[in-house]
Regions:
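N-terminal Lys/Arg-rich, disordered targeting/topogenic segments
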Residues: 1-19
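N-terminal Sec-pathway targeting helices
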Residues: 13-31
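Solvent-exposed, non-transmembrane regions of membrane-associated and secreted proteins
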Residues: 31-205
Length: 205
């Protein structure tokens, strides 16, 4: 009898160790959800990576000198090869650069349609990063009283105009109040940030 009891206990323990159909189904569903979520995340990150790589290549192509000037109000002494930029994209009108956040250093384009560069990079590739572009109503030579330049506030990666959020800090503003516009005619325009605020994309400008 003792032997029979031991055999029954062993059989029960073996049954407990196995996967029942319900548990196996739940596990497979969870695994599928995980794989799908990982795939979606990877697909979401690809544009940030490819777009970032593209703009790094453009910087390597176009910036021929990158020395910082002396004095707070002196523009960085670096030169942009606008001939190469024009060959890559004839819509080029300028180069925009901040000392800090230093990541904001991009070519500026202009199109007859403000929607064109919302999802198209400087090199005309479809990408959610888009490009930094001037309002179609402005003059290319920045002779207007107000010139509007647009760029995306990317939630991941910090590309394009995302880092402008740093100006929410008064200390950051005081430390880095200037930015610079370089144009194909060889001029460098120095601007001082006097106001920064967050508005909806539907706000009138």
């Amino acid at each position: 009898e003792e032997v029979e009891m031991k055999e029954k206990k062993q059989q029960k323990s073996k049954k407990k160790k196995g996967w029942d159909p319900l548990s196996l189904t739940v596990l497979l569903i969870a695994l599928c959800v995980f794989v799908f979520s990982a795939y979606q995340l990877a697909m979401m990150m690809v544009p940030y990576y490819t777009g970032g790589e593209e703009y790094d290549e453009i910087k390597n192509l176009a910036i021929v000198s990158d020395k910082i000037g002396e004095g707070v109000e002196e523009a960085p002494k670096f030169q942009v090869d606008f001939d190469k930029l024009m060959q890559e994209n004839p819509d080029t009108v300028a180069w925009l650069r901040f000392d800090q956040p230093s990541i904001i250093s991009y070519p500026v384009v202009k199109s007859a349609d403000n929607n064109e560069y919302l999802t198209k990079t400087f090199s005309a590739n479809d990408n959610k990063l888009g490009a930094i572009f001037m309002d179609m109503r402005n003059q290319n030579d920045f002779s207007d009283r107000n010139t509007f330049i647009y760029g995306h506030n990317m939630k991941v990666g910090g590309e394009m105009f995302s880092q402008l959020n740093e100006y929410a800090s008064e200390d950051f503003y005081k430390a880095h109040p200037y930015f610079y516009i370089y144009t194909p005619d060889g001029k460098t325009r120095t601007y001082e940030v006097f106001s920064a605020r967050v508005v909806k994309d539907s706000a009138e400008v």
